Design a protein with these regions (language model features):
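Helical hydrophobic small-molecule/effector-binding pocket
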Residues: 86-109, 160-164
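Amphipathic alpha-helical packing segments from all-alpha helical-bundle domains
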Residues: 68-76, 95, 99, 116-143, ...
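Hydrophobic/aromatic-rich alpha-helical bundle segments in the mid-to-C-terminal region
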Residues: 104, 119-120, 127, 138-189
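Amphipathic alpha-helical linker/stalk segments
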Residues: 58-88
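N-terminal intrinsically disordered/low-complexity leader segments
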Residues: 1-9
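Helix-turn-helix
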Residues: 13, 17, 21-55, 59-60
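Short helix-capping/turn signature of helix-turn-helix
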Residues: 50, 109-114
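Short coil/turn segments at alpha/beta junctions that flank glycine-rich nucleotide-binding fingerprints
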Residues: 24-28, 100, 143
Length: 197
């Protein structure tokens, strides 16, 4: 095996081992030594690829991202109306959560860790940021589609909470309880009603 391919395989093995342990034990419950042991490499080799455990955590989260699902978030900021923006964002977030239970689990761990440095991913520039979504909400406020008295940050937070809630409750236990089109329509209608009144 040539050196570049071996290096790539080692990196993949480290990320795969870290993912398994982070999903099982969270950030604080997993040490670099644990990851090295599972990956069958020296701890120092992990530090060759990653400057610290936080960088490895963010890389693991990035490895869980399905670019196709996340690109639909980018489509949200292209919408001309607040109604279509909310509908696209609800649908995009539904698809992301429904197709990625491992990401939900790692985000649950992240919330429990109470460590703000764990937020985001290593290559954040590839995805639409919360700042961009908030900027789009402010555009809708400036164009009269949404009351200016509402905080753009809290609007995005409210949409995020509404779209993740079913997945943090019982969705994983009974996937038949949530019908995609009904969820998108009902959630969109309720959010629009809440923001317009």
């Amino acid at each position: 095996m040539e050196p570049k391919a071996k290096k790539n395989n080692t990196l993949k093995k480290i990320i795969k081992s870290a993912k398994h342990l982070f999903l099982e034990n969270g950030f604080n419950g997993t040490s670099i030594r644990d990851i090295a042991k599972k990956a069958n490499v020296q701890s120092s080799l992990i530090y060759h690829y990653f400057s610290n455990k936080v960088e490895l955590w963010k890389t693991v989260k990035e490895s869980l991202i399905n670019p196709e699902n996340f690109s639909s978030i980018n489509d949200c900021i292209k919408q001309d109306t607040f109604e279509s923006f909310v509908e696209k964002l609800v649908e995009a977030r539904f698809n992301i959560h429904a197709s990625n239970p491992e990401m939900l689990k790692i985000l649950d761990w992240q919330r429990l860790e109470k460590n703000s440095s764990l937020s985001g991913i290593k290559n954040q520039q590839n995805l639409t940021s919360l700042d961009q979504l908030e900027e789009k909400v402010r555009f809708f406020q400036e164009t009269g589609q949404l009351p200016k008295k509402l905080s753009a940050k809290y609007i995005i937070l409210f949409i995020s909470a509404a779209t993740i809630a079913p997945f943090t409750l019982s969705y994983e236990l009974d996937k038949n309880t949530l019908e995609k089109n009904d969820f998108i329509k009902t959630t969109t209608d309720l959010l629009l009603k809440a923001f317009k009144e």
